[in-house]
Amino acid sequence: MRQTFMANESNIERKWYVIDAEGQTLGRLSSEVASILRGKNKVTYTPHVDTGDYVIIINAAKIELTGKKESDKIYYRHSNHPGGIKSVTAGELKRNNPERLLETSIKGMLPSSRLGEKQGKKLFVYGGAEHPHAAQQPENYELRG
């Protein structure tokens, strides 16, 4: 009788991927990266185990936003003090902190659990073309579409 394969920490092989965000649309890039972080691009995907790979995103400052999202899309955060709500538009966030724009988008597509937090820690975003992970020998990843 065959049994369904269940991955565990001992039989997971993790790779490092480098993705160039220049000219890419925010949502399309984010959904594909979230899929890689979860491990859904592998045949050994197991929902309750972190089977995902490490992802390095470079040129985050050159990401594209379609339509009027730069002025209309608003990101909120709260300090947990009365009147402590802060808001910033996607355009301001892209100019001031493009890494956070991508991280927020991608981590919002991961599960809201301890497993999702663990998967989110395998994401590294850099605004420029340089990254300090050359020792891991990352492979270039070609996005679909």
Curated annotation (Swiss-Prot):
Keyword hit for Acetylation: no
Q: What's an example GO cellular component term for this entry?
A: cytosolic large ribosomal subunit
Q: Which UniProt keywords apply?
A: Ribonucleoprotein, Ribosomal protein
Cysteine disulfide partners in this protein: none
User: PROSITE patterns, from UniProt?
Assistant: RIBOSOMAL_L13
InterPro entries on file: Ribosomal_uL13, Ribosomal_uL13_bac-type, Ribosomal_uL13_CS, Ribosomal_uL13_sf
Locate the transmembrane regions by residue number: none
Single GO BP term: translation
Q: Name one GO molecular function term.
A: mRNA binding
Q: Does the keyword Repeat apply?
A: no
Describe the task this protein carries out: This protein is one of the early assembly proteins of the 50S ribosomal subunit, although it is not seen to bind rRNA by itself. It is important during the early stages of 50S assembly.
Can you tell me which family this protein belongs to?
A: Belongs to the universal ribosomal protein uL13 family.
- Extract the HAMAP family matched here: Ribosomal_uL13
Q: How does it assemble?
A: Part of the 50S ribosomal subunit.
This chain's protein is named Large ribosomal subunit protein uL13
Q: Which organism is it from?
A: Staphylococcus haemolyticus (strain JCSC1435)
